[in-house]
Amino acid sequence: MRVLYLLNVSNSSQLSADSGYTFADLLAPALTDAGAEVTVASPVPVGDPRVHFAPTTSPVTKYRARFDPGVDALVTLMRERQPEVVVANQIEAAPAIRAALLEAGVDALIAGYCHYLPFSFTDTGVLELDPAMDDRGLGRSVLLAFAAGLAACDRVLVHSSTAASWTTAAAARTGVDLGNKLHIVPAPRDVRLVRSPDDILPPQGRATGIYNHRLYKHYGTARFTQLARRLVANAPVRLTVMDLFGARSSERIRLDPSPERHLEELATTDGVTIASDRGDRIRYGNLLADAHFGIAPFRPGCPWSMSVIDCQAMGLPVIGPRTGWLAEHIDNELLFDTDEQAVRITERLATDAEFYLLHAKRAFASTADLTPAAVAARYLEAVR
């Protein structure tokens, strides 16, 4: 099976902060091991030399990625690679991919991977547009472009049951019937970030929590900052907050200056340490190993989080707000609705060794089915 994997890399200068690239870097070799001939079309190649590379140029903004997929380049790519399966990691590009295949005279299945949902649903079923995709009121247009992409796909792959439910509901509201297209294929865990819970020691009355998520406003960073202050003031914990971006370009700061503002605020908070992996996954793993638990983001309607999986694969219990995929995936004893509940949970993790080790084992076990080989098998089954 010839697979053309179209990948938009939004953080080419900080690949370790780009979950889509990390996903491809893990999945493409596993697909190759399973017998597929994989070409990754991307600005940068993945690490395995067995995976073919077709260099592309990523759109300079998130809106160009959704509204300007570059049909001319797609037609050339289809003619050169003659794929049997095209993976569209930017769902909104699927209609352009369909048109390019038609023009190139290539008959290939289009599998859309919903790596990012530009919407979420409240507990009462209200559809909310992602504020990060709603500058100058563009959110509705992004939603419709997403729906058009779903309609153009032969297969639609999502991370979780939560994402499947939301995607189905959003499609129905825009007149798209997914039928039997939809498949749940979670992302793989990083083989470099796996630690047996048997090697973990519980904290001795004081714990270190780690927050390893991007500091965008739409990730709920202001809400996390509020919680961070409560935790370091009222629980026996200190926090490590990761700066995943480092120095960003002036263009990216102009589009969204929120990470720099939040980083500055967190850096002046007592009990909070800012750390960077400097793009090194080994250093990142060491930072995780030095922590005792992780904190999930307050991102509204979170459909999946690579950073949560990173923590759990290292045997770190992750606490999180009771919302979206987090409520589906994280153990109920570690979910909270209020800051007071979060304080009590972290106090227990810091002081109750039996409770801590139980949840370290549960965290690790929750990633057991996410090996690259297992995910590749599910992926290939979905696109056959």
Locations of regions flagged by a protein language model:
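N-terminal subdomain of nucleotide-sugar transferases
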Residues: 1-47, 81, 229-234
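Active-site proximal beta-strand in glycosyltransferases
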Residues: 85-87, 101-138, 157
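A short, active-site helix/loop in glycosyltransferases that binds the activated sugar's phosphate group
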Residues: 139-180, 189-191
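Conserved donor-binding/catalytic core segment of Leloir-type glycosyltransferases
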Residues: 157, 200-219, 225-232, 240
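Nucleotide-activated donor-binding/catalytic signature segment of Leloir-type glycosyltransferases, i.e.
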Residues: 253-282
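Acidic donor-binding loop of glycosyltransferase active sites
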Residues: 286-303
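Short hydrophobic beta-strand element within catalytic cores of glycosyltransferases
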Residues: 293, 313-320
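A charged, aromatic-enriched C-terminal amphipathic alpha-helix characteristic of glycosyltransferases
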Residues: 353-383
